[in-house]
């Protein structure tokens, strides 16, 4: 019993020490569970803002402003900063930081979950993102209208490398091709974990995203439906990927709806498996693998399916 008590006491002390390490200079506790890792290196803050090439007339969206290290610098460069913050304690810190200064009138704070909010108009987005919202936030940004000029965002290193991966790269995936369909993506710099307070467990990178304007003339839901199927097993041939019974059931359902709408008679001996294989063969993609296919390849494949009445959404 005494040993158990001693071990429990040790764990309590360890937790107390960990909590102590999360305190800011003002005694504020950071919640790493929701991605509160404050970027503390002013050189990196300035470099990120420089990469955004802000104009004095810009409205800037910042997500996860924390204690305002980057916010204050953005306010000095832009016409207005709209900061989205989930934690009311950090909202109070933000207001306190600019209170009584000329910058206060240029700051607007949106309190709540940015993924659930309607994004306002903005020219540029600059953010040290909570890493757990990286993927949904990127696509919320890229599907946002009206178009913004650019986004300069901090991500977990591996996520950033997936964003910029090319066909044939080990990290090339659905995220890579979907992002690159809608935007130009560039890896700007690596950021070590010790530049944050408290330091995260992973290394980070900064990425610049510029949406393609006008966007490609493609139904994104259709596109993503096709890409989702092919990247489930990206090392498989497309012929093998489309042999999944769940995939064939979905495509047959969509095909029958298409035929019904367009008054097309379906033969009694119709086989969706044969139809799919015929399309893959005629387009030359039967033995191709998603890992090595680029955007143009997927556009040709999607058009090949659509021309035969097969849709993915």
UniProtKB/Swiss-Prot annotation:
Annotated region (Disordered), positions in chain: 1-22
Broad class of enzyme this protein falls into: transferase
GO biological process terms on file: positive regulation of rRNA processing; ribosomal small subunit biogenesis; rRNA methylation
GO molecular function: 18S rRNA (adenine(1779)-N(6)/adenine(1780)-N(6))-dimethyltransferase activity; RNA binding; rRNA (adenine-N6,N6-)-dimethyltransferase activity
Signal peptide: none
Binding site residues for S-adenosyl-L-methionine: 37, 39, 64, 85, 113, 128
Cellular localisation: Nucleus, Nucleoplasm; Nucleus, Nucleolus
Protein name, as recorded: Dimethyladenosine transferase
Species: Bos taurus
């Amino acid at each position: 019993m005494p040993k158990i008590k001693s071990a429990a006491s040790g764990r309590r002390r360890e937790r107390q020490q960990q909590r102590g390490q999360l305190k800011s200079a003002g005694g504020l506790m950071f919640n790493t569970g929701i991605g509160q890792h404050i970027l503390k290196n002013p050189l990196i803050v300035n470099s990120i803002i420089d990469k955004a090439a802000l104009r004095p007339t810009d409205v800037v969206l910042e997500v996860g402003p924390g204690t305002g290290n980057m916010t204050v610098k953005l306010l000095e460069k832009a016409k207005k900063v709209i900061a989205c913050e989930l934690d009311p304690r950090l909202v109070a810190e933000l207001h306190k930081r600019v209170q009584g200064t000329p910058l206060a009138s240029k700051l607007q704070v949106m309190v709540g979950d940015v993924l659930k909010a309607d994004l306002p108009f903005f020219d540029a987005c600059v953010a040290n993102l909570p890493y757990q919202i990286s993927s949904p936030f990127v696509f919320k940004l890229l599907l946002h209208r009206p178009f913004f000029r650019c986004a300069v965002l901090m991500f977990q290193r591996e996520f950033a490398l997936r964003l910029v991966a090319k066909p044939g790269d080990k990290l090339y995936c659905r995220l890579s091709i979907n992002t690159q369909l809608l935007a130009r993506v560039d890896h700007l710099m690596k950021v070590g974990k010790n530049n944050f307070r408290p330091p995260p467990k992973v290394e980070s990178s900064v990425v610049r995203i510029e949406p393609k304007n006008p966007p490609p003339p493609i139904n994104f839901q259709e596109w993503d439906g096709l890409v989702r199927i092919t990247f489930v097993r990206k090392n498989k041939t497309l012929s093998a990927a489309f042999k999944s019974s769940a995939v064939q059931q979905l495509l047959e359902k969509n095909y029958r709806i298409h035929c019904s709408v367009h008054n097309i008679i379906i033969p009694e001996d119709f086989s969706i498996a044969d139809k799919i294989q015929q399309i893959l063969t005629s387009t030359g993609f039967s033995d191709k693998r998603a890992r090595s296919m680029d955007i143009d390849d997927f556009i040709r494949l999607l058009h090949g399916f659509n021309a035969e009445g097969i849709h993915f959404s």
